[in-house]
Structure formats: structure tokens, C-alpha cells
């Protein structure tokens, strides 16, 4: 409580000394009151994003779990959290591939005897040659890139993903994900 009061006192002093007139000071005070009145209404579960990698219209009609991953990809990229972006991009790629296999009734082709799915590397290799999935040439070619970026961000101790690692490949990713959404039957 003491820290809150000290912070408030310092902030009030700053506003008083920096305000040039009564209108400016009272405007700041009114904004504080509005902010404080809404504290109990804060929505901490809504993901705020602007569609920087995956446009909202691309995923607004799919299941909520896929929507959440798409929103997390956009929001993490927009907030410069590039390792997060890379890992979630990989996760969405893998999830949609598995759903595509399920949608085509060929999930057994990527499932071990134990019931676990193959590694993403093996799934991508199978998908690239799989006649039932019939993926486009660019999707076959570009999927390994996003597996690698996601793996580097998740597992390489000395690697940090940067905007330059992701930005040049946004269109490729968008094309892959949209194709997989259709192949998975979620769109």
C-alpha cells in the first residue's frame, strides 16, 4: 500500500508540474478516474492483434482453438516477441497437418504403433509425397522452413528469432496455412 501511495504522489507531482493549465490538469485527472473505474473490468483473456501475419478474415470462421493460435501468432509478432511467433507458427503448421490427415482418413500414415504422431519432420516428408493430401508445390517446398524456425526458437539455446527471420516469409506462411485450413476441412 505504501508503494502505491508513493507512486501516486510522485505521479500527481509530475502531472501538476508538467500541466500548463487547469484544463490540461483536469483532463489528466478525468482520464485517471475513467481508467481506475475500469480496472475491475479488464479483459485479460482477449488477444489483441491486427492481422499482421494471418488476416483476421482468414481465420474468423474456424474453431476457437485455431483462432487463438492465429491471434497469438499475430499478437506476438506485433509485440516483437519473435521466438513466440516462430514457435506458435510451427505449432499451427503441425496441428493443421494432423487435422488434414484426419480429414482425409489417413491419420494412420503419420501415427506410430504407440498411438503418438510422427515428428513434424517425418509428417512433412510424408505430406510432401502424399497423393491424397495433394499439397501444392510451394507448400511442399516451404513447410520445412517454418518447422526449422520454430525448432530453433524452441530448442537452440543461443538462438533468438528476429523480425528479419520471419518478415520475408510471411506471405509463404499465409499461403501454406490457408491451404492447410482447406485440406483440414476447418475452412
Locations of regions flagged by a protein language model:
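Amphipathic alpha-helical interaction surfaces
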Residues: 11-14, 18, 95-103, 126-130, ...
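Inter-repeat boundary and helix-capping residues of tandem alpha-helical solenoids
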Residues: 62-63, 82
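Solvent-exposed, amphipathic alpha-helical segments
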Residues: 65-76, 149-156
